[in-house]
Amino acid sequence: MFIIQKKYRSSLKPGIFTVFLFFCCNAYPQNSSERDTLRNSPVFFIHFHNSISLYGNQEQHNLSSGLIAPKIIQEDKNLIFFDSLKVKASKNRLTKKLYDFVIIAHDTTVKKQITGTSDANYIKYKGIRIRNINIQRLNVFGTNINNPTFNRATRADNIFNKTHVNTNEKIIRNNLLFHKGDTISPLLLSDNERILRQLPFIDDARIIIVPLSDTEADIQVLTKDVYSLGGSYTYKGLKKGSVSLFEKNIIGLGHELGFEMPYDANAPDSPGFGVHYTINNIIKSFVNLNVYYLNGLGNQTYGFDLSRKLVSSSTKYAGGISIKHIKTKDNLGTLAVPEPLKFNSHDYWLSRSFLIDKESVTRIIIGGRYLRNNVFDRPIIQPDSYFNLANYRMYLGSFAYSVQKYYKTSLIYGYGRTEDIPYGGLLRVTYGSEYNEFNKYMKRTYMGTEYSFGKSNKTLGYFYVSSGLATYLYGNLPMQGIFSLNMKYFSNLVSFRNNKIRNFINFDYTRGFERNRDESLRFVSINGFSGFKNDSVYGKQRLTVSLESVLFSPANIYGFRFAFFGFADFSSLFATNETIANGIALAAIGLGIRIRNDNLVFNTFQIRLGFFPNPPMYSKINNLTVSGEQLLRPNNFDSGPPSIIPYR
């Protein structure tokens, strides 16, 4: 529904609103003629060219565009009322300003609970033949994927829409898993809707079934682009930083081109230059290619990635090839003068998925991987340090048992767009061998196991747990071992007036044993400690607990959405054989605001004010941080390539 801005809930507001209604009193009739209503309330409606089609549980009704909109659910009636109001208001400059000044659109599709499965809307149409597939592409600005018949574009919206080329219809069709003449598979349609939403140039997508009879149906695919031209700026000081400019959807083809210019006043070859080019879904294969080059500030990096994921539950094969070349200088933290470092890395992997149960999406996934590190120039290193700078070959194999489906919800990591939250579980066992320059006559064996589980409780919210245990064995001697445990929770949405509140809890524990000398854990920003720096504090174990409460505001200013948050973080670093009581503790409390426009490709803008009650000695504290945050992605239960559990 629509709400009135909180700050106008004063004696002045009724007067403004009354005057506004006076100018537009004939915008919407109080009593509609019974002839203009339908007895059966449809589930939803959508606009096709010059008609409005309504889809109920049984029938399809077509009304000419000249008829009064049918009687529907109250939320949609409110939308019709305020859209009519806006049309009338737009005819007069004063009333138009009053409308924009007083009224805020509120998305009534947000659900408090995280329980709706992504394939629920398609189950009753299972087995029906697909007659036609229609593509409808909405403009970036002034449209709503949940109400595509309504266009609220302002003059500024129309100007920006003209500077953007919507994704080519052929590109959308190339990303579809179904074809004309197929029978409807609820799992396949829900997978496909998620695949479209995950494209970097798509803001949101819907796949809608239009039943024609008991045996036939049309498919309507709705997509809404993001405004694909964007940029970013990384601030590292008055004389150091980086500027980027990118286009994520070149002339609607789904290709991405980006440029980067890092600079440092103390570097002789400043500024640097970088470029990357990405092609998504090459020739309908769902294979992505990324080519990149960066030169400057004493660094040179170039290479490419060619990869295909298990994009859907029915995908059988996934794999990738990655080759990277790096030339730089490094002092390894101890040398007086940085020394040259030159190496390249090769990464090849292949996975095969076997779908065991379609209803629960249970799969067995086996995979193999080969990694090679070739070092041509570097400082002197020891066998028990700087593993990544050693010459080595590694062979890995994995066996995974995966169960995964999705909830469809919003207001978790995003600010209104549809989010796909996985639920299910994953058990993966990884085994491999490593040959490096320090162990020429004897290989190291790697063994690791990982388990993760996630599910929503209707009353409490969503819970996620993951754990991992792994080590290398050199003969019978364990090396570079790790144990990790992570638990995440976020609550159902709680209404507070016209705002929505969600609470987040994160628990993370990592323990390393027999790690290399240079391998340690630190307090880092990913654990909630933005604005803190202390290179002298480290440990082999780390325990972190983070609490955050987020208030999502209904305010929508030219597509910019606001979320206010408060946080409390605690972490402790301690040695392998120490207890937490003997460790070094760090705590932070504070609040902040995040601003995001889902129509744009820019990062989330965050202002964070934090207080550190008792930081360790020699710490550098920045209580106020301003940063661009990337949109977080939920953990899923896909196996991915066979991997080493990271210690970080």
Region roles according to the model:
Residues 17-21:
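Hydrophobic helical h-region of N-terminal Sec-dependent signal peptides
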Residues 481-484:
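Basic/polar, acidic-poor N-terminal "presequence/leader" segments
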Residues 9-10, 14:
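Positively charged N-terminal leader segments that act as targeting/secretion signals
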Residues 2-8, 27-478, 489-648:
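Immediate N-terminus of the mature polypeptide
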